[in-house]
Swiss-Prot record:
It comes from Wolinella succinogenes (strain ATCC 29543 / DSM 1740 / CCUG 13145 / JCM 31913 / LMG 7466 / NCTC 11488 / FDC 602W). The keyword Protein transport does not apply. One of its GO terms (molecular function) is structural constituent of ribosome. One of its GO terms (biological process) is translation. PANTHER family: LARGE RIBOSOMAL SUBUNIT PROTEIN BL19M (PTHR15680:SF9), RIBOSOMAL PROTEIN L19 (PTHR15680). Belongs to the bacterial ribosomal protein bL19 family. This is Large ribosomal subunit protein bL19. PROSITE patterns: RIBOSOMAL_L19. GO terms for cellular component: cytosolic large ribosomal subunit. SUPFAM superfamilies: Translation proteins SH3-like domain. This protein is located at the 30S-50S ribosomal subunit interface and may play a role in the structure and function of the aminoacyl-tRNA binding site. Keywords: Ribonucleoprotein, Ribosomal protein.
């Protein structure tokens, strides 16, 4: 049993953020605040969500994109972090797995995910 004060604090933290519902296979654009000296800017990271794990304020998600020279880049973001400026859902993917780690071994056409038709 968790402390009720901690639970109420976490619910307040979650209610403040405006984050869309997404799952593994969806294409997301994440705006991350970056502090360089005394300046703050927002850097976008766009890719496929390959996993969502955890619950409550400890929830994290992993985004994978193909960088320069076809090098895969993965970043793990805490969902309710203050450094996240925005999370935008670009495409809803059609997948049958909760964790898409098999995409690490694929490249080219086999690494693509079909879009969910409505």
């Amino acid at each position: 049993m968790r402390n009720r004060y901690i639970e109420s604090f976490e619910k307040a933290q979650i209610a403040d953020k405006n984050i869309p519902q997404f799952k593994a296979g969806d294409t997301l654009r994440v705006g991350v605040k970056i502090q360089e000296g005394d300046k703050t800017r927002v850097q976008n990271f766009e890719g496929i969500c390959i996993s969502v794990r955890g619950t409550g304020t400890g929830k994290t998600f992993t985004i994978r994109k193909m960088g320069a020279n076809n090098v895969g880049v993965e970043r793990i973001f805490p969902l309710y972090s203050d450094s996240l400026e925005s999370v935008t859902l670009l495409r809803v993917g059609r997948v049958r797995r909760a964790k898409l780690y098999y995409l690490r071994d694929r490249s080219g056409k086999s690494a693509r995910i079909k879009e969910l038709r409505k």
